Amino acid sequence: LTGRYDAGSVIPATVEAHDEEYGLTNLSFTGGVLRVPRVKALKGASVRVRIRARDVSLALQKPEGISQINILQGKISEIGSPRNEHDGSPPHDIDICVDIGVPLWVRITRWSLDQMELSEGKEVYALIKSTSIDRQSLGQQAQNMEKIG
């Protein structure tokens, strides 16, 4: 987990396949597969995917018929303490770590935490929009990049 406003997770992954029709790349990692916007890297290349905690939603059941294509099952491994706001108002958000094969940090409101009755050990589904993972969120080794031009 990194800084307050940019908190997130870094997931090591491997380029599994490119979907030329839709401009997506499948990245395999210990917990499954992420579909992200096209990565300019060769199949088999190692990449690191940065996912911001604020870009992840949680569900208690596997959702269907939604636009988010990255739906990963996991278990809550840690619930952080609410942070006090600098303006003196009560804290409204909280960071949660979900084990999806690797640690994935999620930032939700305390209201959602209470309404969903979330607790450590509870099974959840993490939802990550593919469009929230941009090229700046992907780090890769130079020798594995495709030649352009």
Where are these regions (language model features)?
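Hydrophobic beta-strand positions in extracellular immunoglobulin-like domains
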Residues: 15, 76-78, 100
